[in-house]
Amino acid sequence: MTLEEQTFDLIRPPEWKGGVIFASPHSGRHYPAWFLAESRLDPLLLRSSEDAFMDRLIASAPDHGAALLTARVPRCVIDLNRGPEEIDPLVVSCAPPVALSPRIMAGLGVIPRVVSQGRAIYDGPMSQAEAERRIACFWRPYHRALAGLIDESVARFGGAILIDMHSMPRDALAHLPRPRPDLVLGDRNGTSASPRI
């Protein structure tokens, strides 16, 4: 199995319509043995960081003319929805200095320090070489595939519509009155999509 096959599944539709791409960067649940040996948590606790079964929810997208890119590598191994520079200095020893965003400070950088409820994944920091290996082996292939789909869509259709799928833990919506929404559409406060979409 190639690294790309370990990182993601890419399913193209029989007929691509309108440049729609569904992606699920946090649905990976194929835990490498080396990672399980390094983690201080049991596999069930590690799974709490997944957007569990999101890939199955959108599995029929290709049948409706959309491309589908889903993660196989778990979010707690590497977060495909972060920038490669978002390195937590508490996870990676001798990490290059970066601006500490709220996500990094919360332990949710490109290589997460914690899973849900702040449970630490590791007993101590990993080497810079290990962090670079994960980024090269998992993060870069996923983003090459995603960029390739977007570029192809722009060339064929004049644009691309990326629908990046995530689930939310119950406690993230606890502040909302009941009934809580079944679906939340986000556009990064109007910065990632045209209002027409």
Residue ranges and their predicted role:
Residues 1-162, 167-197:
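N-terminal catalytic or cofactor-binding beta/alpha core of small enzyme domains
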